[in-house]
């Protein structure tokens, strides 16, 4: 394995927009719900962690291996969340050396900072669905009591 593309969905009661990713993952109720990945450009696989599925040892080792290049849109978020998920000691995170951020690469080329915006500008056949965005917000963002 040379590369792994990663996309995760998470939950935390902490508002990430107001507090940032570090506080977000420190919440007692933080969890990774879904882990999608593709190895060396192959078929995308989805691990439903929220329903008891587990990452294979091969994937865990790839996350820890600095020789495997990890790609993600907003890689900093994925890296910090997965550091917590892997139960690394507090203040210890996966090494950024082996991570590549497609959001930053997109911005470098003058594209929007959102995955949805990049898809629109590039005219990609498969776009981020608005319904999916709404579902993620519903399941991954805690509700404010009324």
Where are these regions (language model features)?
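Active-site-proximal helix-loop-helix substrate-binding element of RNase H-like nuclease domains
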Residues: 32, 37, 41-58, 63-146
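Entry/capping segment at the start of metal-dependent catalytic domains
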Residues: 1-30
């Amino acid at each position: 394995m040379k590369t792994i593309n990663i996309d995760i969905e998470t939950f935390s009661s902490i508002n990430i927009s107001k507090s940032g990713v570090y506080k977000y993952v420190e919440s007692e109720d933080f969890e990774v719900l879904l882990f999608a990945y593709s190895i060396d450009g192959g078929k995308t696989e989805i691990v439903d962690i929220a329903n008891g599925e587990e990452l294979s040892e091969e994937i865990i080792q790839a996350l820890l291996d600095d020789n495997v290049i990890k790609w993600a849109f907003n890689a900093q978020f994925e890296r910090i969340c997965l550091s917590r998920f892997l139960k690394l000691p507090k203040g210890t995170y996966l090494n950024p050396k082996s991570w590549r951020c497609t959001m930053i690469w997109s911005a470098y080329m003058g594209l929007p900072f959102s995955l949805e915006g990049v898809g629109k500008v590039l005219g990609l056949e498969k776009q981020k669905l608005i319904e999916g965005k709404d579902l993620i917000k519903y399941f991954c963002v805690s509700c404010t009591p009324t």
